[in-house]
Amino acid sequence: VESSDKAYEEDQEMTGFGLAPIKPQGQSIVYDTAQQGLTSRYTHIAYALGFIITHEALKDNLYEKIGMQRTGSLAFSMRQTKENVVANLYNRAFNGSYNGADGTTMISTAHPTLVGNQSNRLAVDADLSEASLEDICIQIAQAQNARGMKIAIMPKSLHIPVNLMFEATRILKSINQNDTANNAINAIRSMGLFPDGAKVNHYFTDPDAWFVRTNAPEGVKLFQREEATFEQDGDFDTSNLKYKAYERYSTG
């Protein structure tokens, strides 16, 4: 989460440099150029909701009971909204109607770079299992930057819907291999490949989809333009009391 003081934020990708070549004695240094890559824009969106307590309810001494209850419900609705907005990044991660700056979905086998397409998705989609987790861990460890250099990232946490919370626990925490008669260790657990464990997200809509967060320095972001505020005011024409909540942020 990062704060923002503008109408939108932008991330400008820079490719960095390639490997350093051998410098022969007396020869000039070879100079490389960091190239400008893709630009990602995060346009802040306002979310607001309110409710009204009638003049009659106020006069009948129902303010304290109704007001406190509905104010709590309003705060809950604002929190739920943000949870759903962020979760939708993952719910739409395979949906071609929601492509990113590189023209592909968030999870794709064909993210374009200077050295060719790169993938953050298994070549063949697979349900959550010990084998599929091992495959994605290998793929993560082989990740390259835009100049084709290994970046040595590793998995940190597994993010799952509620439907997979028991299966994920068995896979990550079993001492031996899960669902097999083999007397072999659970390599994922023994190697400590998911130090932050499994995180259950109640807002994921696909019961089979699972995601791995790595220790890469850049990833999914939330820019907070305006924190949630709660205000109340009276309406002159009706003598009703109005309550409202407002918040502005962006994700991507």
Residue ranges and their predicted role:
Residues 1-47:
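Assembly/oligomerization interface modules of large self-assembling protein complexes
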Residues 5-7, 19-23, 29, 99, ...:
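Polar low-complexity intrinsically disordered regions enriched in Ser/Thr and small residues
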Residues 27-32, 53-62, 162-166:
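Short alpha-helical interface patches
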Residues 39-97, 158, 243-245:
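Long, contiguous amphipathic alpha-helices that act as assembly "spine/axial" helices in icosahedral shell
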Residues 40, 45, 56, 104, ...:
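Flexible, active-site-adjacent loop/turn segments at secondary-structure boundaries
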Residues 64-66, 76-139:
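Alpha-helical scaffold segments that mediate packing/assembly in large oligomeric complexes
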Residues 95, 99, 146-151:
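Surface-exposed acidic, glycine-flexible loop patches that form ligand/cofactor-binding
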Residues 107-145, 152-157, 163-252:
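Sequence/fold signature of self-assembling virion shell proteins
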